[in-house]
């Protein structure tokens, strides 16, 4: 069995009374892209800083290709970093920014040209930073991080400075470039769409603890707890009671459900798994949001509010309706 490229064992960090990261462990294969995803204060950035060597660990260790790099400083670890605000030098040209961390030898110009080709900025060497768009500046920062040939690349909220209209295209370009290079990458983001688009794997963090590590599909389809189920993607959470294996009662209606929970539960259901029906849980349409071809409805019921994705003509605002779920996930109420 091939040993992991990166092995993180029991990372912990406390700031005073605040446990920022607690006993975090995971492995990452060479060339994989991992997205650290979580709400504010979940420990994403602290984890990244510990891995990069900018923050001292209270406990744990970090191994790269089997070697313990925990005692090493940032430079000795040979990791690259793209900061949230890029940290480019506005008074220097693109070439000078990318070459900043390279030794002044005969290969410097060829290395700068090589990484600029990789990020699709060939011919931009003489331009100033002020002449570039936000997406181009992001790629200059990426080229500078790649120029010293790091073993591992870190991206801190890499697309947060871009307009929403640019993010989707830039995400695709960034992932394609990193996959072409084949560099192992860890990125921090609070945006689920960004994490799912860039990460081969996504680690969901909450209160400094790893909730689940898996592919985007695994997190969405098979969340391990209620937090992951409701944090990843859109979902409605309602109180229910398990009445039989694979069945949960919500209000006066039984739905199919998955999970090992018993007794009183919280049932989580995705908008695409809820349908309007002739008989089911009664409710009132309190919101109807056009999505283009379909709509997102919010239906208030005695058991709670459900979101439903359905054709726009399915129901009018304030209409009295009945709804049911084709599938759901149930969790014991202490599993949050």
Task: Describe the function of each predicted region.
Residues 58-61, 207:
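Conserved coupling/switch loops of ABC nucleotide-binding domains, chiefly the family-specific signature
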Residues 37-39:
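The feature captures the beta-strand-to-loop junction immediately N-terminal to the Walker
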Residues 60-68:
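Conserved ABC transporter NBD signature motif
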Residues 76-80, 84, 88-227:
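ABC ATPase nucleotide-binding domains
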Residues 52:
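Helix-to-loop junction immediately C-terminal to a conserved catalytic motif
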Residues 235, 246-336:
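Non-catalytic connector elements of ABC transporters
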């Amino acid at each position: 069995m091939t040993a992991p490229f990166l092995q993180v064992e029991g990372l912990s960090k406390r700031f005073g009374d605040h446990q920022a990261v607690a006993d975090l462990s995971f492995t990452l294969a060479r060339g994989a892209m991992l997205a650290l995803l979580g709400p504010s204060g979940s420990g994403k950035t602290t984890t990244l800083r510990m891995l990069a060597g900018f923050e001292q660990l209270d406990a744990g260790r970090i191994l790269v290709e089997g070697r313990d790099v925990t005692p090493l400083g940032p430079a000795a670890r040979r990791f690259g970093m793209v900061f949230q605000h890029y940290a480019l030098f506005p008074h220097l040209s693109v070439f000078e920014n990318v070459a900043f961390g390279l030794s002044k030898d005969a290969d410097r110009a060829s290395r700068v040209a090589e990484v600029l080709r990789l990020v699709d900025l060939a011919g931009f060497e003489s331009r100033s930073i002020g002449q570039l768009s936000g997406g181009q500046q992001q790629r200059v920062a990426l080229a500078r991080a790649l120029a010293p040939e790091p073993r591992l690349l870190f991206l801190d909220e890499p697309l947060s400075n871009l307009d929403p209209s640019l993010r989707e295209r830039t995400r695709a370009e960034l992932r394609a470039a990193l996959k072409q290079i084949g560099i192992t990458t860890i990125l921090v983001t609070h945006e689920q769409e960004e994490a799912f688009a860039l990460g081969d794997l996504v680690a969901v963090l909450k209160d400094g603890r790893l909730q689940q590590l898996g592919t985007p599909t695994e997190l969405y389809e098979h969340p391990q707890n209620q937090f992951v189920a409701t944090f990843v993607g859109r979902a409605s959470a309602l109180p229910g009671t398990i009445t039989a294996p694979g069945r949960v009662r919500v209000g006066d209606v039984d739905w199919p459900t998955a999970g090992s929970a018993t007794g009183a539960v919280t049932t989580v259901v995705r908008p695409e798994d809820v349908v309007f029906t002739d008989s089911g849980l009664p409710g009132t349409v309190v919101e109807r949001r056009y999505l283009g071809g379909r709509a997102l409805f919010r239906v208030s019921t005695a058991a709670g509010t459900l979101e439903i994705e359905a054709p726009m003509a399915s129901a009018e605002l304030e209409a009295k309706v009945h709804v049911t779920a084709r599938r759901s996930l149930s969790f014991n109420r202490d599993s949050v």
